[in-house]
């Protein structure tokens, strides 16, 4: 595949409509017209509200005769109180849709607002483990368009969102099968201005998604194929995107790789995310960075005995040695190459939190799909390793 191939505009439907290619943001007015949208609410995170892509989106919508409000109060780790404020904004502005633009936090925030925008249910009634909420036709979720501006979370196609429960200090997955984006718009131009550290952190998140999803037990050839192709794209293009941030092919490859890995984790995730969710909820750490630090610890715990899985992942990354040790060494080399810190302590997570983080991680839905079950004591040892020396 050539660089030109990667930059060729494409329209896919898998599992939702996806419009991919440089400059596709300019088509957002046409998409709104096709969906019958007149007054969407733009949802983004606090760090993105003053960035050029927000004003550009507003301008393109205005030129197309579409009025739009803006809600930009989503934190890097979205909180339940912010979602409530966003719901009030949606209702008071008589909005008919949500356009979630930004990183994973913005898209998760937009999805969470959608869940309660037209009903009086508590947000936590949509928690993954809860009985599925019955949503009637008169309470149908608003139309949702997702526009990622980072290449990492893969949140743009998902029906799930991660939100911090402020009362419990824990992250939970909220979900409803009827919540599906009507369009994911993937424009690599929107990621060109992403700083090197965020390119690295969000890109490493995509790698974690691909690896964890592929390692989840069970027969799911669709997700497995997407995970391996996503891993191949990320392994090839992430170092390039960090070193040469204006390389459009690298940005495009990363955006597609991230999307594929995000679709793949319909299959599930694992202990990297179980721990990372709780660290992020308590210490507000950047999600992709936290995942990247923890990853080698969990690989050393999970991979022995999984040589059949490791071989295919090694092939995807272009390795000639498909042993478990060689695969872990390559992952660690890539993390070193993009300057990922070697421990959670280096990003300000205190050493005395291991016990309570482990206790919370055991309750995370991602722990239930990890390929190797961890006891409570083992989980605490994993957290301690990530705190002290992950690689």
Write out the residue ranges for each language-model feature.
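An N-terminal, well-structured beta->alpha segment
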Residues: 1-70, 389-391
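N-terminal small/polar loop signature for handling phosphorylated ligands or for N-terminal nucleophile
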Residues: 49-122, 239-251
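Glycine-rich phosphate/pyrophosphate-binding beta-alpha loops
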Residues: 152, 259-291, 364-369
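Gly/Pro-rich interdomain helix-loop hinge
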Residues: 282-353
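Short, amphipathic C-terminal "tail helix"
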Residues: 351-391
């Amino acid at each position: 595949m050539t660089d030109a191939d990667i930059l060729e505009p494409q329209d896919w439907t898998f599992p939702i409509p996806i419009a991919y290619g440089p400059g596709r943001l300019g088509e957002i007015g046409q998409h709104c017209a096709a969906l019958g949208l007149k007054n969407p609410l733009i949802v983004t995170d606090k760090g993105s509200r003053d960035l050029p892509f927000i004003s550009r989106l507003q301008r393109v919508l205005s030129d197309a005769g579409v009025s739009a409000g803006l809600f930009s109060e989503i934190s890097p780790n979205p909180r339940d109180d912010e979602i409530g404020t966003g719901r009030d904004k949606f209702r008071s502005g008589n909005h008919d849709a949500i356009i979630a633009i930004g990183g994973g936090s913005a898209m998760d925030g937009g999805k969470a607002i959608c869940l309660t925008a037209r009903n009086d249910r508590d947000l936590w009634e949509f928690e993954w483990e809860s009985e599925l909420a019955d949503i009637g036709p008169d309470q149908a979720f608003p139309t949702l368009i997702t526009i990622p501006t980072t290449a990492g979370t893969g949140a743009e196609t998902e029906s799930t969102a991660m939100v911090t429960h402020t009362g419990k200090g824990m992250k939970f997955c909220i979900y409803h099968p009827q919540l599906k984006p009507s369009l994911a718009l993937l424009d690599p131009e929107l990621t060109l201005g992403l700083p090197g550290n965020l390119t690295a952190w969000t890109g490493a998140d995509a790698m974690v998604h691909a690896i964890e999803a592929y390692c989840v037990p069970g027969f799911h050839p669709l997700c497995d194929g997407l995970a391996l192709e996503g891993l191949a794209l990320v392994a090839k293009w992430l170092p390039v995107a960090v070193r040469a941030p204006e390389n459009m092919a690298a940005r495009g490859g990363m955006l597609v790789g991230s999307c594929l890995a995000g679709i793949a984790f319909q299959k599930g995730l694992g202990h990297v995310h179980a721990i990372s969710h709780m660290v992020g909820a308590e210490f507000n750490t950047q999600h992709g960075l936290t995942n990247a630090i923890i990853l080698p610890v969990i690989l050393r715990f999970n991979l022995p005995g999984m040589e059949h899985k490791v071989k295919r992942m090694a092939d995807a990354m272009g390795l000639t040695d498909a042993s478990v040790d060689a695969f872990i060494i390559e992952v660690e080399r890539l993390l070193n190459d993009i300057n990922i810190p070697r421990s959670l302590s280096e990003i300000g997570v205190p050493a005395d939190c291991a016990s309570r983080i482990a206790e919370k991680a055991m309750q995370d839905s991602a722990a239930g799909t990890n390929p190797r079950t961890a006891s409570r004591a083992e989980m605490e040892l994993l957290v301690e390793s990530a705190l002290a020396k992950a690689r």
